[in-house]
């Protein structure tokens, strides 16, 4: 879609929604609307139902974590209008305690997307019919896509041959320190390493 057409769409949406749009950005051939949490459902409903918009397909909901911000999460909704051949992105900001209204009443397919955002980031959705984890295991601690989640996780899940079942154990780093040999003859060095049978001798 052309920049001009996206600019016209942005102007039309801002005219219809007024203060419900905090910011509209047009960059790289994509339109992004930033809206307050309280206006989210109204904005999504208008984008779906308005004849000029017809964004009837919710293709994704994702989270983005900015731990240095007061409202650390962006919740990003990707919408598609097959009739208009247009895509649009809607963003809201939330902190760990903010309840984002569930988009399930507007787009039924939002149910699993919101469960994934909850599971991976801990983003809370009010009015969701079944807000529970969807990807991680039962009893999983934390939310693995948050920037402050440890790379190793909190527990190690593995199959124990002796017990014939899956076991959960505290993470143990098998190799706390590793001494790398940076003086390798394969790196084009001119010196001979002790014990290197292939080293050149003068």
UniProtKB/Swiss-Prot annotation:
Keyword NAD: yes
Record field: catalytic activity: a quinone + NADH + 5 H(+)(in) = a quinol + NAD(+) + 4 H(+)(out)
Membrane topology: Peripheral membrane protein
MF terms (GO), sorted A to Z: NADH dehydrogenase (ubiquinone) activity; NADH:ubiquinone reductase (non-electrogenic) activity; quinone binding
Subcellular location(s) of the protein: Cell inner membrane
GO cellular component: plasma membrane
Subunit structure, interactors included: NDH-1 is composed of 14 different subunits. Subunits NuoB, C, D, E, F, and G constitute the peripheral sector of the complex.
HAMAP family: NDH1_NuoC (MF_01357)
Name the record gives this protein: NADH-quinone oxidoreductase subunit C
Annotated source species: Brucella abortus (strain 2308)
């Amino acid at each position: 879609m052309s920049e001009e057409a996206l600019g016209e769409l942005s102007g039309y949406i801002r005219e219809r929604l007024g203060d419900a749009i905090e910011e509209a950005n047009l960059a790289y051939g994509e339109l992004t609307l930033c809206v307050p949490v309280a206006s989210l459902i109204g904005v999504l409903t208008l984008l779906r139902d308005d004849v000029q918009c017809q964004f009837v397909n919710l293709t994704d909901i994702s989270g983005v974590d900015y731990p240095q911000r007061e409202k650390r999460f962006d919740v990003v909704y990707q919408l598609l209008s097959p009739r208009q051949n247009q895509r649009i992105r809607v963003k809201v900001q939330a902190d760990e305690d903010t309840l984002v209204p569930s988009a399930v009443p507007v787009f039924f397919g939002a149910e699993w997307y919101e469960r994934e955002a909850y599971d991976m980031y801990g983003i809370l959705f009010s009015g969701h019919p079944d807000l529970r984890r969807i990807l991680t295991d039962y009893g999983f601690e934390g939310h693995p896509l948050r920037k402050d989640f440890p790379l190793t996780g909190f527990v190690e899940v593995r199959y124990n041959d002796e017990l014939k079942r899956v076991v959960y154990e505290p993470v143990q780093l098998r190799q706390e320190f590793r001494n790398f040999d940076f003086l390798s003859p394969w790196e084009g060095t001119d010196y001979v390493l002790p014990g290197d049978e292939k080293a050149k001798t003068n």
